[in-house]
Amino acid sequence: MNKRLFPALVAFVIAIIIGTFFFSKEGGEANKNAQILLEQLNKERQKSQSLAENGSYTSKDEVALYIYKFNKLPKNFITKKEALELGWDAKSGNLWQVSGGKSIGGDRFSNREKRLPEADGRKWFECDVNYNGGRRGAERILYSNDGLIYYTPDHYEHFYLLYEKRMQ
């Protein structure tokens, strides 16, 4: 989706929601749902506008939105190979000491157990989220080369879809 079309699309969706909110014959529940959806859209729009392409991000929501918006990881991510070349030892949890505060991300995820959707030509990648130094935690984002973005809070036990298609 063109970057200029996105604000117009958001405005259109908001207008429809507001129209539903004001002109709903059902009242009560429909109005509450419209209000909640409108608030969520406004929050997402504000988050999207506040992300800088040259920024560093570590939280699940920011990293997922960054991948969705820019089709790449933030600058504060390095692959395992790059980390090893800097002297990283996973057992000692010294990543921040050798990398200047970077997080692990960008390596291929094999999806051997086929727990994520498969498609011809689809490749999966992973990155750590909510990393605060020391040993790596269990939280990861898995993202595909065709725009799927998933979150796992428990090292690949459960997966939650965050985004389905990239912004263009």
Label the predicted regions:
Residues L9-F21:
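Hydrophobic membrane-insertion alpha-helices, especially the h-region
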Residues G19-A34:
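Sec-dependent signal peptide cleavage junction
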Residues A30-K72:
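N-terminal low-complexity, Pro/Thr/Ser-rich intrinsically disordered segments
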Residues E53-S56, K60, L73-N76, D120, ...:
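Solvent-exposed, acidic/flexible segments
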Residues A64-L73, A138, D146-I149:
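Second-shell loop/turn segments in exported
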Residues T79-E82:
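A charge-rich, low-complexity, intrinsically flexible signal that marks solvent-exposed coils, linkers
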Residues L84-Q168:
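Functional cores of ribonucleases/endoribonucleases
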